UniProtKB/Swiss-Prot annotation:
The chain crosses the membrane at residues 231-251, 265-285, 320-340, 349-369, 396-416, 450-470, 516-536. Residues 17-230, 286-319, 370-395, 471-515 are extracellular. GO terms for cellular component: early endosome; plasma membrane. This is Protein mom-5. Disulfide bonds join 37-98, 45-91, 82-119, 108-145, 112-136. Pfam families: Frizzled, Fz. InterPro entries: Frizzled-4/Mom-5_7TM, Frizzled/SFRP, Frizzled/Smoothened_7TM, Frizzled_dom, Frizzled_dom_sf, GPCR_2-like_7TM. It comes from Caenorhabditis elegans. The lineage of its organism: Eukaryota, Metazoa, Ecdysozoa, Nematoda, Chromadorea.
Amino acid sequence: MHRHILILFLFGCLSADQRLSSTSISSMNGFSTTRKCEHITIPMCKNLDYNQTVFPNLLGHTTQSEAGPAIAQFNPLIKVKCSEDIRLFLCTVYAPVCTVLEKPIQPCRELCLSAKNGCESLMKKFGFQWPDQLDCNKFPVTDLCVGKNSSESSNSKNYRSSNDVTFGVSTIANEVVLSPKKCPHHMHTTSGSHFSLPLLSGRLPECSLTCEADNQVPMMFDGRVRRILRIWTAAWSVACFVCSLFTLVTFLVDLSRFAYPVRPILYLAFCYLAISTVYMIGVVGEDGFACGTYGSTPTTLVTQGGENVGCSALAVVHYFFFMSSCAWWLVLCLAWFLAANLKWGAESIAALSPYFHAMCWGVPAVLSVTVLVTNSVDGDVFTGICSVGNLNPSALVYFFFTPIVVSLALGAVLLVCGIWSMIRIRSYIKLQHADVERNISKLEKLMLRIGAFAIMYSLPTAMNAAIMWYQAVNMPAWLEGWLHHRCVRLQDRELFGFTYPVDDCPMDPKVAAPEIIVFLLKYVSQLVVGITCAIWVVSSKTLSSYHKAYLALSSRSPTVPAHVDQVNMR
């Protein structure tokens, strides 16, 4: 709040300063030659790569005492570090570098644009525009000028990386939009505006990640590790598919046995049957869905947006059924709560089933449409599927992480209340005299099964949410670090088509790449619940249900009439 007040005060001062400044950048041709260098005394401009300035400056201020209050108005922008170059840019305007040249050296247009791109969006939030007196078109492009300061950039990058890891705000928002020219030629896309890469320095539009695995400078994992991830996912998806199918068949064989409050497990199993099918299709399809050719070169890039119909279909199915599983988990906890705390019967809970279905299928459908409209679909090069938020931290947090956490939290509250009620019922039964041990034993078994299933669902789902948050916060740093190493390697500059100098390469945030165990746990946590559902239905009653179903089918088989047998014997 205090920061916002400071920024509002800054912008009010800026408006007044624009009216007071009558000397433009272009009027410096009449710059006086009777001048001398003086030591910088303006606090904001101390400890830069230069310590001597000259006046009048580029805005017409004749002394440092006059320029000091004017540049001090920008202190809030410096403090929030909206741009890595804002401090250097302002100082080269208000306290220009003193040299042996006749005129003071102006800041380069690139330096101005870097400062403007970082801070203009913040100014617009408060209803102000970038000051006309600092119009970047007034500054030179190729003449002698002050460019980016590498040490300043490094310090600012380190600050931004630390801020992102701590709070996850700048990483997830990524409001700064970089120039598309920063994207290497072989990663540049021509298929639409929905392609972009989230970097620590901002969002890089019209750009996508290469799909090819590389062992020299891998994007997180090399080819060998990617194969391990693909095999790992295939094994767990097959196991999840088999167990989910077994659960579905078990329910359908004797549906009356699984009334509410346990009926939602049927729909949970159906959701994970669909999720496992998506992963198996991704394994079989290799990179046909997650990757494609979207630029002017034959380089395969990660699919983003809804252009690839197959990719979009996989992503929607994966997202829809994952959100439905979260909703059915919440309904399962609610049904247990109604049965244990409010003493509702199975018929009373079943009467609410139309509302349960409307919520569990309707809300995910709305979210799935939103995902498509916002182009939040992209490919996962490690599994071959398409899903939400692999290269989009905002989508991963808003569409995946948040619903999972909300459903887990609400479900946990309902579950704890239900279990507490069962504990009270157990204490009450102990006071009875008829068949006490038998009743207590049945209740304890039910409590044990409910608690075990809740743990086997909650732990993997919570782990999945934690890994998603970890991925969303660190993905911009991983991408920027990978792009930095590609940019500075001479053999990669030509291979990828970097068109700007090495000095302009992205800074290395020095964030360690994730361990393979993180992504192994990510994929298993999305599939293991399907196996958990099968554990719930495994019992002696299940064997009895299958035996009865077999006998029922056998009794329907056609029998040979007796007189036909007699004829054949003759």
